């Protein structure tokens, strides 16, 4: 069993310190996000937990402070399903932070029943892609000011199943929870690709990561047979701490090729659709149109 886990989980460690650095982690109250915050705080970073549920965020911050001596963690309200909340969060960051060296777009919803965001977008596309797209847009000036800086978009190993349905991005014609989810995860990689090409010369690096198959709260909407598999074959599934390895690898390893996709702490091959520069450019333009912004 230990041999199998060795194939599934690539162990990785680093002694890099982050004293004087500031990081934002979305969806930081549980799972991979919480473990990411813990590691960054342990390296001396000031870490902002960007969370929708402040009660859960307070508990996460308390847990981290117990594990990490003198942890510099701060809680901020962020609802990625509401552009007004995203604007308020960004305004608060500019008013309270002098720099931002690391933005980890980790939050996500998965395979949930059909619903829409406050702005009318299908929830998985709206939160997983558009919410983080808008957040990154609003924080880009601070990231550029703090360069060298890094943006990390958490995608998924299931992105090859995805297709960008430009004619029905919000799944209004035909909603299927899995199709909507994999579309959003493919969008994460296309966004990474396009953003990297635009900001590399400004000192901002951008990476997409696959955390692997991880046992987290995001599985709560999965069908019962899949939940049974997760529980039965748990030894094959990463812990949240293990799921954070690749995010941390990209955050802490210097000179990695920007715009690339990483899995198990190494650069990985993504699907043909995820390498389509025309789709990446089109998704960028459509996302700007949907959000009512101009981002050149």
Specify the residue positions occupied by each region the protein language model found.
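Rossmann-fold NAD(P)H-dependent dehydrogenase/reductase core
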Residues: 2-223, 292-296
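Amphipathic terminal alpha-helices
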Residues: 280-296
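Residues within alpha-helical segments
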Residues: 24, 58-61, 91, 193, ...
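C-terminal helical subdomain
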Residues: 184, 208, 231-279, 285
């Amino acid at each position: 069993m230990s041999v199998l886990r060795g194939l599934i989980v690539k162990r990785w460690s680093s002694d890099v310190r982050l004293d004087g650095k500031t990081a934002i982690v979305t969806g930081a109250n549980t799972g991979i996000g919480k473990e990411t915050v813990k590691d960054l705080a342990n390296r001396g970073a000031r870490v902002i937990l960007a969370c929708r549920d402040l009660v859960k965020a307070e508990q996460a911050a308390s847990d981290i402070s117990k594990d990490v001596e003198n942890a510099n963690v701060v809680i901020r309200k962020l609802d990625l399903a509401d552009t007004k909340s995203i604007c308020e969060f960004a305004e608060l960051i500019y008013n309270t932070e002098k720099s931002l060296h690391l933005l980890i777009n980790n939050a996500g919803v998965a395979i949930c029943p059909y619903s829409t965001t406050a702005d009318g977008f299908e929830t998985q596309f709206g939160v997983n892609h558009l919410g983080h797209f808008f957040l990154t847009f609003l924080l880009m000036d601070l990231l550029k000011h703090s360069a060298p800086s890094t943006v990390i978009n958490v995608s998924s190993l299931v992105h090859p199943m995805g297709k960008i349905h430009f004619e029905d991005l919000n799944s209004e014609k035909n909603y299927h929870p899995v199709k909507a989810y994999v579309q959003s995860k493919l969008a994460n990689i296309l966004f990474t690709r396009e953003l990297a090409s635009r900001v590399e010369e400004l000192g901002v690096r951008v990476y997409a990561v696959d955390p692997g198959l991880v046992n987290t709260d995001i599985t709560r909407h999965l069908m019962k047979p899949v939940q049974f598999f997760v529980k039965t074959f748990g030894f094959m599934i990463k812990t949240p701490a293990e799921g954070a390895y690749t995010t941390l690898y990209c955050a802490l390893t210097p000179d990695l090729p920007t715009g690339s996709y990483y899995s198990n702490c190494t650069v990985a091959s993504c699907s043909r659709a995820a390498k389509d520069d025309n789709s990446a450019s089109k998704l960028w333009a459509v996302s700007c149109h949907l959000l009512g912004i101009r981002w050149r």
